[in-house]
Amino acid sequence: MIQENIRISVIVAAYNIEEYLVRCLDSICNQTYHNLEILVVDDGSTDETGRICEEYAGKDPRIQVIHQNNMGLSGARNSALKIATGEYIGYVDGDDYIEPDMYENMLDACLENDAQLAVCSYRQIGSEKAQ
């Protein structure tokens, strides 16, 4: 495992996804790499998304919540990007969840290859399609 002196800002855009958000945030909070700044943007949700965001922020000091009027995915991401302090930026959609070692593996790959960007594949759950 690499030294945890590099901060990764993880940006989560959330709009009316109360049924998925807990699993998403749990998957980020439980990463094997811990030096994360987690920026969750409640993009004008009308369900319990905002409350769930605040609940998680109260439990984990790495989480900051931004509440804003609905600006769409790009607007939500850009709002968080303005305040992000990490040396690397990661994006997780609020209705997705990630493997426990995703950010550790991606950062390792960046450092080993002197890369400024890492991308990964995804698996579509509940469907026969996988990318």
Each predicted region: which residue ranges?
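Nucleotide-sugar donor-binding/catalytic module of glycosyltransferases
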Residues: M1-Q131
